[in-house]
């Protein structure tokens, strides 16, 4: 009996398709600045242009401010690449930090840590979506990304799949190189 089961497993093992991760995206309210390109950010629309680097931020997070400043130094060069490496900052603690707090810290050229890319403001109720049809799924955006702390970064390929992540609190001398290497692997 065991022999028959073993033979069946061996013979049928090639018949099973490996599971591939399905892409996920989000559509979320922004600060509605010029840099946000509208009041709602669609990751699916942005992925049609190129990969997206997601940075979870908080107003009181020192590491988030350091990451923002480091990423800002490379943002224009990354946007000039083909395809561009886009960035979106995701406010993590909207229950405790107001939209105005986020705008003051990150939203304006005169802000301490100006962010020249979209900033989105998800709530705990905003759902992650399937990339094909943008249907809302049962997980929230935060749940899908593993209830991230701040700062936390994820590189999303053009299929909506997470291909790299970093939970390093402060960027170091290798951080930008890591991001650029991950980008090269997904294009």
Map each language-model feature to its residues.
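Loop/turn elements at helix/coil->beta-strand transitions in domains of secreted/extracellular proteins
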Residues: 48-53, 81-86, 113-118, 149-151, ...
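Thiol-/selenol-based redox modules, centered on thioredoxin-like
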Residues: 138-144, 148-187
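Structural microenvironment flanking redox-active thiols in thiol-disulfide oxidoreductases
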Residues: 65-116, 120-130
């Amino acid at each position: 009996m065991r022999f028959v089961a073993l033979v069946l497993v061996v013979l049928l093992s090639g018949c099973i398709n490996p599971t591939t991760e399905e892409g996920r995206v989000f559509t979320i309210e922004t600060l509605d600045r010029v840099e946000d390109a509208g009041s709602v950010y669609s990751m699916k629309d942005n992925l049609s242009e190129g990969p997206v680097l997601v940075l979870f931020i908080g107003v009181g997070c020192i590491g988030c401010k350091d990451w923002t400043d480091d990423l800002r130094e490379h943002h224009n060069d990354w946007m000039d690449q083909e395809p561009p490496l886009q960035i979106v900052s995701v406010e993590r603690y909207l229950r405790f930090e107001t939209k105005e707090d986020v705008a003051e810290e990150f939203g304006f050229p005169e802000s301490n840590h100006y962010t020249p890319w979209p900033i989105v403001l998800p709530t705990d109720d905003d759902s992650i979506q399937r990339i094909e049809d943008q249907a809302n799924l049962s997980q929230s955006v935060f749940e899908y990304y593993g209830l991230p702390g701040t700062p936390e970064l994820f590189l999303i390929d053009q299929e909506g799949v997470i291909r790299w992540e970093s939970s390093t609190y402060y960027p170091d001398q290798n951080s930008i190189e890591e991001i650029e290497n991950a980008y090269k692997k997904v294009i």
